[in-house]
Curated annotation (Swiss-Prot):
Protein name (database record): Imidazoleglycerol-phosphate dehydratase
Keywords: Amino-acid biosynthesis, Cytoplasm, Histidine biosynthesis, Lyase
Organism in which the protein naturally occurs: Clostridium botulinum (strain Okra / Type B1)
Substrates-to-products reaction catalysed: D-erythro-1-(imidazol-4-yl)glycerol 3-phosphate = 3-(imidazol-4-yl)-2-oxopropyl phosphate + H2O
Annotated family: Belongs to the imidazoleglycerol-phosphate dehydratase family.
Length: 196
């Protein structure tokens, strides 16, 4: 499988982020956001998606983790969009159900060029480490809107919030891997319109 590499750099008054991804990698990762729990989740996404991710973020963590998490979603979304290029030959859709002990999450992706997000999470704690659990949805929204993809994510059940969020990020990686997979039978893009 050929490489599909993208580099993105973004600097604002709140964050400075640089990333490099290879959509058809081996799941290697070197991720430093300053938010330990978030790094752990992004590592899982990369590993289970077989996406190589190098990412370094410096943010205003003295305020809280919101800007950093959201802006990482923006940068990764831009990276995915750039790495996908013309989208010719990709399967377009990906769905994954991932169990993590007592928790089960599902996540579906459509690389449609039409950003949309639906999340159904019922986390029972406000924070895990230094990350607010509500930022899981903020990250996914930023990713979807900047990559131009639709994401439907749901935690079907679970008791341990770490397990629930871990299942979501593993499912994200696996769904991305399925959606960007290329099929030589697909002539052009997977759409009757001829464009995504």
């Amino acid at each position: 499988m050929k490489e599909s590499i993208a580099k993105v750099y973004r600097k604002t008054g709140e964050t400075e982020i640089k990333s490099e991804i290879n959509l058809y990698g081996e799941g290697k990762y070197d991720i430093k956001t300053g938010i330990g729990f978030f790094d752990h989740m992004l590592n899982l996404m990369a590993r289970h998606g077989l996406i190589d991710v190098k990412l370094e973020a410096k943010g205003d963590l003295q305020v809280d983790s919101h800007h950093t998490v959201e802006d990482v979603g923006i940068v990764l979304g831009e990276s995915f969009k750039k790495a996908l290029g013309d989208k010719k030959g990709i399967k377009r859709y990906g769905t994954s159900f991932v169990p993590m002990d007592e928790a089960l999450a599902s996540l579906s992706i459509d690389i449609s060029g039409r950003p949309y997000i639906v999340c159904d999470f019922n986390f029972t704690v406000d924070k895990l480490g230094e990350m607010d659990t509500e930022l899981v949805e903020e990250f996914l929204r930023a990713l979807a809107f900047n990559a131009g993809i639709t994401i439907h994510a749901r935690v079907l059940y679970g008791k341990n919030n770490h397990h629930m969020i871990e299942a979501v990020f593993k499912a994200l990686g696996r769904a991305l891997r399925e959606a960007v997979d290329r099929d030589e039978r697909i002539n052009g893009v997977m759409s009757t319109k001829g464009t995504l």
